[in-house]
Amino acid sequence: MPSTAVTLTQSASAQSIEAIASRSLKSIPLEKQAADQQPSVPIDPLDSPYPVPWNWVMKTYEGVSAREGSGVRYYRSHSLLSPDGEYAAYSRIQMQVQPELYRSQVSSVMFLENLRTGQLQEVKASSPLALHLMTQGKAATPGIISILAPIGWSKASDRLLARQFEGFFSTSDVSDYAVIWHRSQNRTTTLAPAQVYNNHAMSILLGWSQTNPNQVVFRVGDLGDEQWQMWTVAENGQTTLATSVEQPVVFGLRQMQLWAGEQIASR
């Protein structure tokens, strides 16, 4: 039986920056992209096919806490180019290190650049912890992890799909949300399977549904479960058990740049 989850929408704010040079593009299905990345995939708390830079997070905490006690460090992801070559999306991750891991914080900003005009805008998630960080600022609860990063485009380049990974350090309370940016309307939708909202289950974002490209696919379960089921989620929040032939896909080209990775800037 389908069930319904809460969805949240918001518009992206815009600003300007120099354009990134566009390169030739091709479409990459999720299965091939994940396979190509396997040799260098970092550890991900949810074993996602689109991992967050967890090795960097943990090494940064260990290094800064041991040498300085506390500090701020930054990480910049590679760009994800749209199939039509007109947009690039990337994230800048910030880690505020405290002597205790459970008091440290990881947050992020995801940028979307129009490569023809050079216009840059910020895409934001409306998931619970992302909203908490936006509204509370320095008064936010310690230990929050909130990382938004692009994972794929639609085949027509009219929608961008991003993974919002959030939870708390030193706990098993982590999960994924999907953030969809609509090109024609310049708005975003944040959604997750109904089980995440109603039963506090854990979910892993897998990509667009191949059988229904307007929906996204998650793997959902609880810690300790041997079998996690695949569910599709529509933009109105309707959550339905995926069919046996479901195969998640994404499109776009990941642009490998020299300036991606750990950033020198710190304070």
Which residue stretches match the model-derived regions?
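Sequence signature of WD/YWTD-type beta-propeller architectures
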Residues: 2-267
